């Protein structure tokens, strides 16, 4: 087995690490100051992100996530270590490279399933970061992890579809640059469960679309990311040409969209873990208690050793998954995709918890990134399918081998 990266990956990784050291990490306190400025428009992209985007384009670090003609043409295995690096500063690096969710998943969806007209109208400006987008699937009144529960209706009426329903935690939708909502709803409630849903493209300014409020995540409004909106759709009419794929294909398209998204989340989460471990090591070498450095305490050494082992385990599993996605496709890598989605966020949560503990009161303060990183990572155990759904599916697949 060859565990080395190819030449292109090594070159991009070196370039990206230099970009992080020279531009991203120094910009973190700038971002904090801009977000704290009461005069700044709350939901707009902070100016520092716009500045970083200019530099990222100059460096050729743009749309790295997207394979094929529309992006950098990287495989999943080539992109994985780059996504990990961006995870070390998840609030700055991914948007700086135009590699932040939910736009990444929406661009992948449009590139794979969109018509030529849909790609021209929506994909091209997204690739250029002239607009933003959101993915509207989660609903407040039902357990949205079961697609059959989705209550939003998408009804054909002549040459149009009419959308009625309510969605929430629609990431990015508070940003005024968010122009597109990809909405999941039911077109045929009588069909078999995974053929009931369809997806339509809804302009955010369409009549009947109402942003009710911004939601918080553990008290964070994630304004720099465009927040998380609760949105009502009341008699929203869109042309029939705004349907993505065919009627009844919504669930299959969602799964195709979420597969790459899950590996992107997991690689960035490993970057979060590396950042947390680095902060832990620096902290315990610098702080003294009971007559010596915290680093001399056996329990602290146990945290550090366990963190390193767990990071290496995660990375190997995620890289194997990326390789399988490239060689046998997302469907063939389904078990591994679910495995990394189960293992990575909870393991990174453990590493972050130890980092917080090592920092004491500072670990829960705004003076380190740890509290925000913990909140960000904890959501991944729910986003793109909760742990329990993935475990249930994976266990059933495992049991089928013995029946």
Identify the role of each PLM range.
Residues 1-91, 99-101, 113-118, 125-130, ...:
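Alpha-helical interface subdomain recognition
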Residues 73, 211, 242-247:
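Cytochrome P450 core scaffold surrounding the K-helix E-X-X-R motif
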Residues 106-113, 135-136, 190:
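Flexible, glycine-rich active-site loops centered on histidine and acidic residues
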Residues 129-138, 183:
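A short, Trp-centered hydrophobic/proline-enriched beta-strand micro-motif
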Residues 141-145, 172-176, 189-191, 217-227:
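Short Gly/Pro-enriched turn/cap motifs at secondary-structure boundaries
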Residues 149, 205-237:
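Flexible, small-/acidic-enriched active-site or ligand-binding loops
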Residues 151-153:
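Short, surface-exposed charged micro-motifs
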Residues 159-160, 164-212:
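A short core secondary-structure module
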